[in-house]
Amino acid sequence: MKNELEKVMSGRDMTENEMNMLANSIIQGELSEVQIASFLVALKMKGEAASELTGLARALQKAAIPIPTNLTNAMDNCGTGGDRSFSFNISTTAAFVLAAGGVNMAKHGNRSITSKSGSADVLEALGINLYLPAEKLAQVFDKVGLVFLFAQNLHPAMKYFTPVRRQLEIPTIMNLTGPLINPIPLDTQLLGTSRPDLLELTANVLKGLGRKRALVITGEGGMDEATPFGLNHYALLENDKVTLHEFRASEVGISEVQLNDIRGGEAPENAEILKNVLENQPSAFLETTVLNAGLGFYANGKVDSIKSGVDLAREVISTGAALTKLHELQAEQIG
């Protein structure tokens, strides 16, 4: 640990193998919380490298509990969190729209770290069982085409990181790594990050981890979602190449709103917002969900433009298919 910490503090990047070995030491309980915290902070101050993200992701994914699903072409749309926007649960709401539109959604998430309500919190408020065994989760996914994978339940190694992250109260490499370690192998991904400087790097990490197509998004003001206001920046992984782009919501058929219009609350309030959106009740929440679901359809390759994805998202919600998908998950992911 001492050599690795000195290397990072001197501004040098760790190799993928060095990070992998250090991560395994943490997973095996060989390092104290103080050592883990100092390492996370040192990495943040230096700036995380692709080799470090990849090495950590591979170690954590290998240590995860596998989900024996029969489905292929799985996708996730989780973000890094840590943007302190206190918005409603955008990607979680959009996941129902994507699943209703024919995308196999392996929604990976956790409880809140820096916000009022994480994806696990809001889904628990909707009656979703976070603690099903892997075999049952696979059955849910195979039947519904959507499942929620609770990170704490499926990543035993996280118990060494979670207390440290809560005490630090700042985004670290763990925020960046969380979306990379879905227990179900992913073919495509929409990943939100609060750091626009990491768009290209993250897309290249996803490429290295085997994604066939992916989109990494940063919204206005560093939100880890596409925003219905201001300028959105994204990196697109397509045909093994990463390209950078930008767009405004108004350019793809979304009514622009303000950040205050999409702020959420505690889990029960956000659960109500989610249901209202899937019921197609007009609001800034609906526009934001349509935008991010549309982006998800584009990231998945189901449509050939963000605008086409937005149109598909509106159709899926207006027909009631997204609300039906919520009811299906509520009926299956129980126990």
From Swiss-Prot:
HAMAP family named in the record: TrpD
Where anthranilate 1 binds, per the record, is at: G79, N110
Q: What does this protein do?
A: Catalyzes the transfer of the phosphoribosyl group of 5-phosphorylribose-1-pyrophosphate (PRPP) to anthranilate to yield N-(5'-phosphoribosyl)-anthranilate (PRA).
Which of UniProt's keywords are assigned here?
Answer: Amino-acid biosynthesis, Aromatic amino acid biosynthesis, Glycosyltransferase, Magnesium, Metal-binding, Transferase, Tryptophan biosynthesis
> Which named protein is this?
Anthranilate phosphoribosyltransferase
Q: Which residues form a coiled coil?
A: none
Stored Pfam families? Glycos_trans_3N, Glycos_transf_3
Q: Which pathway does the database say it acts in? A: Amino-acid biosynthesis; L-tryptophan biosynthesis; L-tryptophan from chorismate: step 2/5
Q: Which cofactor does it need?
A: Mg(2+)
Q: Which PANTHER family match?
A: ANTHRANILATE PHOSPHORIBOSYLTRANSFERASE
Superkingdom in the source lineage = Bacteria
Entry EC number(s): 2.4.2.18
